[in-house]
Amino acid sequence: TPPPPASPAPPPPRRTAEANDVLSLLLATHLYCVLQAVDLRAMEFEHTKAFEPMVTELLKQHFGALATAEVEDKVRKSIYKRLQQNNSYDLEQRWHDTFSVATGAVVEALAGQEVSLASLNAWKVACAEKAIALTRSVRDSFWAAPSSSSPALKYLSPRTRVLYSFVREEVGVKARRGDVYLGKQEVTIGTNVSRIYEAIKSGCIAPVLVKMMA
């Protein structure tokens, strides 16, 4: 009978420590990115809640009874489709471009109706200007809120809220807002990832994870 195959030798201790360090760094980077994505998605939800009624109101204001639910639906689809395509544009350019494209959807939806070019242009300009102002307002109020009362918290479950609050408040890693928005150099992404990494390596995050699983 042939002897059983030998068990593989365990990795050297130094390699094990290196693997743990790499894994901790990957977890820290992933957690940083996930929380930033949570904040941005929550900001989008807050914006949408105010944006859609605004579009409806301006359609009715400029086109009256012609602005039926069907017309609103076509225009809304055109807007969101264009926003997916021009997300690399600056704020003002993006909204003016979006409503220039959406004007075509209005023309198509109201084909056969008497709609003046002046009304179309007035609607386009009004929508773009109000969308720009709304975006700035939502963004400013979102970033101004302390982490303990961030609008993002209401979109999280009680368990994930614990982890969000730990990173944002106890570790002190805030959402990245950008140097242009702040008007000065912000703490680098690498520095913030390092803070989360240290919380993982030191074991500070362990009670938080236990609380999440309770």
Segments (PLM) and residue ranges:
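C-terminal auxiliary extensions adjacent to catalytic cores
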Residues: 1-214
